Amino acid sequence: MRKNSVRKLTISALLIGMGVIIPMVMPKIMIPPASFTLASHVPLFIAMFFTPGVAVAVALGTTFGFFLTTPVIIALRALSHLVFALIGAWYLQKHPSIVLKNGQFTFANWRFQGFNFVIGVIHSLAEMLVVSIFYFIGNMPETYYSQGYFYTVFILMGLVGLSTV
């Protein structure tokens, strides 16, 4: 076995461990179908800087953590993170210079902020799709139908979801 694969496996395991623990112990704001868990995206964002494989493993592992502690709709929203994690990790692997400014590593540059915005839009769209499916099959509390599709999906999941990244 190569040293590099053991390293990636270890990093994945540590990040998955963080991803499973975070929904259990961190504070949450729950406005179903929305649940905003403090630091829930951190392991996934760290994983994106390694490889797409690590990002996928961590996305699946954190989804498991949410399945243990939250309703199915929220856990499936966590599974939707697989989409933006895979796209983001692939892009970072192909364009590692996005985090460089004048040859120095920095997060404070416009190219990286643009990348974050695009990832945020993908994140929101994927979560909106999950909530839309639950909305249209009638598997949500009645109060969300009385608030309407626009509020439940676009405001609660779209705009608020965009700001969580």
Model regions: which residues?
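Loop-helix junctions at membrane interfaces
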Residues: M1-V165
